[in-house]
């Protein structure tokens, strides 16, 4: 029986990225891999940290270095993860954001092959790239109006921890990225593995709707 291919998870980071938006989900995936290896199974997730620039200052001032460039092609199956940025509105009028949006517009999402995961106002970035048109999505409550304004064809859902619409998975923000990744681990691996990861991270397996 052929081995299940690993899922490549691409965290696309801009300057000012909210650290908890990506660090929490990344840790969930790391712990999932660790648990699988402890059971004698292969790791399931390969994490990539990509950016228009090789160095980026995060929301808390920590500097990320050695970021990989935005790839011309993605190993599949793959998830592209977009996260929120510091500030009340998402600034896309800068070279880094324009480069990321250009790259995002070239993605061809397909369930089980190339999927989008947004945390917090990462959904607004996705909307600027046209990836949420005709889709239902959520975002941080402070960005719900902005999301609706950026793409009037996106069905914006309030009061949701996370939701899924085809190949698009979105979450409300900050710690809810962990909730969403636990759900994705449960879907792609097993509910038991998701429960082990939640226990290791000392978080609830599922909060709210």
Predicted segments — roles?
Residues 26, 30, 148, 178-182:
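Predominant activation on well-ordered alpha-helical scaffold segments within soluble catalytic domains
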Residues 164-198:
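Conserved anion/nucleotide-ligand pocket segment
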Residues 133-161, 196:
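A conserved active-site-flanking secondary-structure segment within enzyme catalytic domains
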């Amino acid at each position: 029986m052929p081995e299940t291919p690993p899922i490549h998870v691409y965290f696309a980071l801009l300057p000012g990225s909210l650290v908890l938006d990506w660090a929490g989900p990344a840790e969930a995936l790391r712990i999932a891999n660790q648990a699988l290896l402890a059971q004698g199974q292969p790791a399931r997730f390969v994490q990539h940290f990509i950016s228009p620039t090789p160095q980026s200052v995060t929301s808390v001032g920590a500097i990320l270095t050695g970021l990989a460039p935005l790839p011309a092609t993605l190993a599949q199956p793959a998830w592209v993860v977009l996260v929120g940025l510091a500030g009340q509105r998402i600034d896309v009028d800068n070279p880094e954001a324009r480069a990321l949006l250009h790259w995002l517009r070239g993605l061809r999402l397909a369930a089980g092959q190339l999927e989008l995961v947004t945390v917090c106002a990462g959904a607004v970035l996705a909307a600027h790239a046209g990836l949420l048109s005709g889709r239902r999505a959520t975002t941080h409550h402070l960005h719900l109006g902005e999301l609706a304004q950026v793409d009037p064809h996106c069905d914006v859902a309030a009061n949701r921890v996370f939701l899924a619409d085809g190949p698009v998975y979105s979450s409300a923000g900050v710690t809810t990225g962990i909730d969403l990744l636990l759900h994705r681990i449960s879907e792609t691996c097993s509910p038991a593995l998701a429960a082990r990861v939640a226990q290791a991270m000392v978080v609830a397996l599922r909060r709210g709707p």
